[in-house]
Structure formats: structure tokens, C-alpha cells
Amino acid sequence: MSDSGLQTDVLVVGCGIAGASAALAAADSGKDVVVLTKAPSETSNTFYAQGGIATLGANDAPALFGEDIIKAGDGLNDPEAVRILVEDGPRLVQEILIDRLGVPFSRGADGGLNMAREAGHSRRRILHVMDTTGMSIEKAFLAAVRSHSRIRFLENWTAVDLLTVPHHSRDPIAYYREPRCLGAYALDNATCKVARVMARETILATGGCGAVYLNTSNPREAIGAGYAMAHRAGARIVNMEYIQFHPTVLYHREAGGFLISETVRGEGARLVSTDGRTFMDKYGGLRDLAPRDEVARAIFEEMILSDSPFVLLDLASYAKIDIPKRFPSIYRACLAVGLDITRQPIPVVPAAHYSCGGVLVDGRGRTSLAGLFAAGEVACTGLHGANRLASTSLLEGLVWGTRAGKEAVSWLEEGGVRPADVHDWHYPDKAEDVDPALINQDWLTIRSTMWNYAGIIRTRKRLERAKADLEYLRHRVEKFYQQAALDPKIVGLRHGIQVALMITHAALANPVSAGAHFRLD
């Protein structure tokens, strides 16, 4: 691609389940689509999803599913978003994942789909591919996206900023027009050159922001780029205080935030203290199957009471299943660090896992900025309220990704802005090489600050300290960014500090504890 860039009908930024669904939906309508990803698609949150994807099980109904979602979300869910998911989701699972992509979901001896149960669900309704569901879904989607004649796949590119009118327009008269997204400035990670990707409609599907925390189940690429770009472009962002912490991530220095799926507890595993006591009984009737926020706080409190950096998840003593067969990925990962989970309990800690807030969208994925759609974790549909029910993230990505792709095509305008109408990327006259020591230390500051001051349990004083420290750092990072020779690391750092502040500001502004946002004061 030349520095002048390219033009397309629809630009999709990201290629997890939401981005891939959107790309296929738009391309199936006969439109040209560019899919932009900053790293190999195997680093998406979809790829790492173990537990499964919710649908409707036996003796189940949309109303029951919806009740579980609303209960987990502390009643702050958008009822219309819940209705869309429980009515459209099961149909799209069948039509796209099973019939079209052939995802090999686990089946029972009778050949029927095997349904698991997870925390917060009143029925067994979780489809899974053993414990590698996300990997199987992502591989199937990638094969379909890469082979589609109307989709151009750009891997190893970093989205720097969204292109908008009037902000990036050469035409001064454009300031009288309604703000509109026109695509994105994109950095070729190999050459470190920036190109304009002009699009008549743009769909953000960049995933979440767990990697702004010290402990996370997300890949390190999950720094919230989409939130930051949408915020700078003027799109409305909501509910950023609702950061869900997964209760059980493997506690081991070599584990890299490996997630121990809630399905493990669904199959009977119990949380126990380091001296062998079960403790979830005192935190509510659902015990180990309580919603994630309750379990995460219970573990956090138990760690404080026992002065231990972890608790134990005992699968071997309580689950009546063939552990290596049911959880092959978890079994192998634990074995690799010296744990035989058929005999030993698993040391676990809570970790930042999912953002329930994001770029506000309607039922079709439209944001408040014309020309911009969003789907998946980067979007806030209102579905999750204050806390997400287990195994609904993949389903939400599938539903809103498909809807956003179709809706973007229906809004395509004739003509559009030409690349010549938009400013070229400005390179500093004397760009400085990026010092990795500065990048690493700035990230350590962000992640430690967020974990200690804006984590599982928050107070006004902690959040005010986080705000002050992060604001100071943001000014330094912005100066660093303006003077540096552009590369993916400095772009990512700029996105990350912006997102950390968005979370902190939202948490400070909301004194009411609900779901994943817990204020001790």
C-alpha cells in the first residue's frame, strides 16, 4: 500500500468474532471490505475464550436466559439489548457457527450438542469445543474471511486514529458539516509508515482493555485502542467503570495470565483457602456459581484474611468427570508449570477480564458519530449492565458484529471523500527513536496504578490518586508521542494511558457500587 492509502466501502478494525462477523456480513452484501488487524489474529480475546458461547438449552427459554443476564448485570441492562441477544443469538449460532462455519462443538454420546453450565446461568446452555471454544470459532472465521473474494485482509497494521470530518479535512468549509468518520490512519508495523484507509463506513471491533491492568486474562495487545480512538474522534463512551475481573486466573509466574474457565466450577470444582477450607458458602446461596463480581471480591477478601497471594480451586476432589478429556487445554497448561490438576488444586487469583462499557451503540451497532459502528467488547450495547454473565461475550460479538456489518452496508453513501481531501500524516522533522526502557516503565506505572487504585475494590482516595498520577503521565506520554518516530509501541502507549484515565474518571464519578464497580466508601 502506498502512503496515500486506499479506499474501500467498509473498513473493519479488528478480527475477533465481532470483526469477522461484521466483515462477512458486509462482504456477503457485495461490498468491498478491508479488515485491519495490528497483530496475528491468534492474539484476539476471542481466540483465548475457553468456556463457550451461550445459546438456549433443554428446558430453556429466551425469557429465562434474559432474566439471568439482567440479574448478573445488577438490573442496569438495556432491556432491548437483552431481547435482541436472546432472540437473535441462538438463531445466528445455528446459521453461522454450526451450519456455515462448521464449528465442531462438543457432543454427547447420543450425538446431541453438549451443554455446560456456568456461573449465573439457571440452565445448561453453554456450547463449547472442550475448553478451546474461542480458538475453534476464531479459526473457522479466519478461514472464511481470508477466502472471501470481497475482503482484503491487512495483518500487522496498527490503527493510529480515526479519520474524521472536519478534523482531518483540508477544506475549511468542512467545519460547517456534521462530524463524520471517514476511515482511519493506519501504521504499517513493518515499515512504520502511516497510510490513510478511507472508508464510506467504519466498524470498530478492537476488543477490550484488560491489559491496562497488572493482572489480566487478556493478551497484552488488549490495551483499549478502540475506546481511545473513538473518544478522540468525539464518539460517546459510557460505563467504563464496569471492568469485570475474572475470578480465576492461574497464579504462576510462567502462566502469562492463563484463564481457568468458569466451566470448571460449573462441573463441580470448589474454591478453597490455602488451608483447605471451602469459603464461598458465606458469600451467598449460589456459592461457587455466583456471578463473577461476587466471586472475585470473595476471593480478594479471602486472600486478605489469609494473607495469601492466591486461593485454590479444587477440581480433583469435587468434580466427577474425566478431567483431561473435559479440560484438555487447562490440563496441559497446568501440567506445563508442574501442576497435575487430577491430583492437585489450582492456585488462582482474580484478574481484569472484560469491559462492560465502551463506545455506545444502538441495536444495529451505530455509534453517536456518523459513519462509525462498533461491535464486540469495544462497544457498549447495554446488554451487560454493570456486570457480564458468563459466556455471553462471544454471543454478543456474533450478534452485533453481524448487525453492524449489514447496517453499515445499508448506510453507504454514494461518492464520499477522496484521499486528496484529507491531510497527509504529519511526521516530526527530527523524530527521536523510541526508547524501550521508557515505554516499559510507563506501562508498568499504568498497570500498577490501575491494579492498586482502580481495581477490584475502589475508594475515592485511591481513585483520586490514580487520576493525579495518570494525568501527569498522560502529558509526558503525549509529548513523547509527538516527538517520537512512530512505531506500534508508542501508539499503543498513547491509547493505553487514555483508556486508563477514562476508566478512572468514570469510576470516580460514580459513587454507587453496582456489579463490577465496587466502591468501599
Region locations from a protein language model:
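Glycine- and aromatic-enriched mobile tails/lids
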Residues: L6-T8, A25, S29-K31, P40-T43, ...
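Short beta-strand to alpha-helix junction loop
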Residues: P79-P90, R125-A143, L154, T216-G224, ...
